[in-house]
Design a protein with these regions (language model features):
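Short small/polar-residue motifs
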Residues: 34-44, 71, 79-83, 99-103, ...
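An ectodomain-focused feature that recognizes extracytoplasmic/extracellular
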Residues: 20-74
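Beta-strand signatures of extracellular beta-sandwich domains
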Residues: 75-77, 137
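Beta-strand elements of well-folded, non-transmembrane domains
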Residues: 59-63, 78-82, 142
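Bacterial Sec-dependent N-terminal signal peptides
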Residues: 1-23
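Generic marker of residues within folded, mature protein domains
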Residues: 9, 47, 64-66, 76, ...
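Generic cytosolic/nucleocytoplasmic N-terminal low-complexity/intrinsically disordered segments
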Residues: 1-2, 36, 57, 171
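Internal interaction segment
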Residues: 82, 86, 91-185
Length: 185
């Protein structure tokens, strides 16, 4: 039993390190409690000679892990009225991590999930042209979704931080592939 627990702890630590290595997570600033706000970051890797960009989404729940299936998706509404659908990366695992915080005499457990979604070039183009994200909907599975209205004063900052996350992901991917680009000099 102790060995199984040790393996599980090691697996959880590895998953959280993987998520941390993927990029800095950007808070979705909305009216939700600070601990329950989703966080986003871009990741990029090369598959079959193609650079593939994904959006890593971290969600938090206090009762249990959020559950995802193949119908999971993220809908992003931009300030120009456009809405973009990001589908869950087929076959990608949902990474999970539990942590606790003490609040007075109570200990609260938080259940984090990390899920990857496909990113269309349109999302990057809108961020590059300074178009802010005003709303995010995470569809965990059919009939189970949550909307996040982005606080107006934070919209531009969030778009800027996400663009920076994308640029950092591109540079990391270049370095992993041995590209000694001068972009980060």
């Amino acid at each position: 039993m102790k060995k199984v627990f040790s393996v599980m702890v090691a697996l959880m630590m590895a998953l959280s390190m993987i998520a941390a290595e993927r990029g800095k997570l950007i808070h979705v600033d909305c009216s939700t409690s600070k601990n329950l706000k989703p966080q986003l970051a871009f990741c990029q890797e090369t598959k079959d000679g193609q650079d593939v960009t994904t959006l890593l989404v971290k969600t938090v729940n206090v009762n249990q892990y959020n559950e995802f299936n193949d119908a999971s998706r993220v809908l992003v509404r931009f300030a120009d009225g456009a809405a973009v659908r990001l589908n869950k990366v087929p076959g990608s695992a949902v990474e999970k991590k539990k942590h606790t915080e003490k609040k007075g005499n109570a200990t609260i457990s938080f259940y984090d999930t990390y899920t990857s979604y496909e990113v269309s070039p349109e999302v990057i183009e809108k961020l590059e042209t300074g178009i802010a994200i005003i709303k995010v909907r995470i569809v965990f599975k059919e009939n189970d979704s949550k909307d996040y209205d982005i606080v107006e004063g934070y919209q531009a900052k969030m778009a800027e931080d996400l663009l920076k996350s994308y640029q950092e992901a591109v540079l990391k991917n270049r370095k992993v592939n041995g590209d000694t680009a001068d972009d980060d000099f």
